[in-house]
Structure formats: structure tokens, C-alpha cells
Amino acid sequence: MKLTWMMIVAVLFLTAWTFVTADDTRYKLENPFLKARNELQKLEASQLNERGCLDPGYFCGTPFLGAYCCGGICLIVCIET
């Protein structure tokens, strides 16, 4: 009997916890790990945009170690692809 009540209380607690921690319980329950991953990807993309890039014809340094070329590759100078 005690085990039954303990199981009922545990299920009610976990259900309440799920609804309290969900962002929007009316439509769907979101996976917090996927949400965190998407936010991290957005952060990385915004940091790449802030870094800036070089136009074709500008010196970029050694390939793969130099500066980032806009819409091209780096072979000592930025080359359009």
C-alpha cells in the first residue's frame, strides 16, 4: 500500500515538474538539449559574422591559417570561387 502511494506521488511530481519546466505546454514539450544546441549554433554563427572577411584580391596569409575570405578560398590572396 505504501509503495502504491509512493509511486502515485512520484508520477504526479514528475508530471508537474515536466509542465513547470516546459517553455510552452499548450503546443508541445521541447527538449531542452535541442534548444541549447540551437542557441549555441546561433551564437557561433553570429560570432563568425562579427569577425569579418576579406574581399577577393586582398592578402589573406597562408591557406587555412590566414584570414577568412568572403565567398572564396585563401591562396595567399583571396580568390573568388
From Swiss-Prot:
It is found in: Secreted. Disulfide bonds join C53-C70, C60-C74, C69-C78. Pfam families: Conotoxin. Expressed by the venom duct. One of its GO terms (cellular component) is extracellular region. GO terms for molecular function: ion channel inhibitor activity; toxin activity. Its main location: secreted. The keyword Signal applies. Keywords: Disulfide bond, Knottin, Neurotoxin, Secreted, Signal, Toxin. Residues 23-51 form a propeptide. The presence of a 'disulfide through disulfide knot' structurally defines this protein as a knottin. The cysteine framework is VI/VII (C-C-CC-C-C). Belongs to the conotoxin O1 superfamily. This is Conotoxin ViKr92.
